[in-house]
Amino acid sequence: MNDQKVVLDKGPFFHGTKAALKLGELLEPQHMSNYQDKRSNHIYFTATLDAAKWGAELAASQAQERIYIVEPLGEFENDPNLTDKRFPGNPTRSYRSQSPLKVVAELASWERHSDDAINQMLASLAKLREQGTAAIED
């Protein structure tokens, strides 16, 4: 019998947000979603800097955009909102967990997407909301 656990990804892992967090702080589910008007049952994170940038840039707030390096403290799964959607598999290496993430560092500097790209993404998300198809599988 093989009791070896399959690890989806070894990281490093990132969480993009506009929340000011302290090192060692835990990110937990049941906070208001940045993308829906409800509490989220999961905490979302990624192993790609590009996806973390989108998380920070699209978060619902006027606060400073931040990207944290995080450590999952429990099991996690592929984010079903992105996995096998536009592309097969999980090329954005996006995950979600019902267990906390521990903040281990903050990226001091990173290059944002262009304002045009961010505005296009915001317009696309607004269109999905208008069409009623922006629901997140949570």
Where are each of the predicted segments found?
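Short amphipathic beta-strand and strand-loop transition segments with alternating hydrophobic
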Residues: 2, 56-57, 106-111
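Active-site and NAD+-binding cores of ADP-ribose-processing enzymes
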Residues: 18, 25-26, 63-138
